[in-house]
Each structure stands twice: as structure tokens, then as C-alpha cells.
């Protein structure tokens, strides 16, 4: 579920975008490695590095959700909003864990 409030990652948005652009470069490099018939282990090493970098971005966004979105919902005193944000958090963590 999404809403129109400021996202929890707003303070680090530019840093996250920069990191995602670096990851994009890594993925393009992996594509070139395949095109150039590079050694399997070298390709897998780069895939692992890109995946780890992407997981770190995801964790930072998840942290922002907890420290801003969930915190604000709880602090508001609105039990329904707090329950909704908590449910969203649980679903996000479940999806994130499945990625691994």
C-alpha cells in the first residue's frame, strides 16, 4: 500500500539514485562479460557484487520505512494507521527475505 506522504528514504534519495546508477553500470558490465565470453566464475562474482549492492539499497529503504513511516504512524496515535504500516512492514520484510 502506498500513500502520498513523504517517503522514508527522502533524506537519502540522491545517494540511493547514485548507488542505483552504479549498480546499473555493474549490470551492463556483466552483460559485456557475457558478450565477451568471460569466465563463468568471474561473471558470477560480478553478479554477486551487484546483488549485494542492490540488497543494501533495499535495506536502506526498509530502514527509512521503519524510522519514518512506521514510526510516524505509531506516534500519530492512530491505531488503524499504525496497524496498516506494521502490516506493510511485515509484507515488505517477507518479500525482501524471499529475494535472498
Predicted segment positions?
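Solvent-exposed interaction patches of small proteins and small membrane subunits
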Residues: 1-100
Amino acid at each position: 500500500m502506498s500513500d502520498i506522504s513523504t517517503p522514508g528514504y527522502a533524506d537519502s534519495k540522491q545517494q540511493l539514485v547514485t548507488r542505483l546508477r552504479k549498480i546499473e553500470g555493474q549490470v551492463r558490465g556483466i552483460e559485456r562479460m557475457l558478450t565477451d565470453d568471460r569466465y563463468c566464475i568471474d561473471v558470477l562474482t560480478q553478479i554477486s557484487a551487484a546483488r549485494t549492492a542492490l540488497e543494501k539499497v533495499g535495506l536502506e529503504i526498509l530502514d527509512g520505512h521503519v524510522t519514518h513511516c512506521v514510526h510516524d504512524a505509531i506516534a500519530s496515535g492512530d491505531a488503524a494507521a499504525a496497524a496498516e504500516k506494521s502490516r506493510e512492514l511485515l509484507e515488505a520484510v517477507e518479500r525482501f527475505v524471499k529475494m535472498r
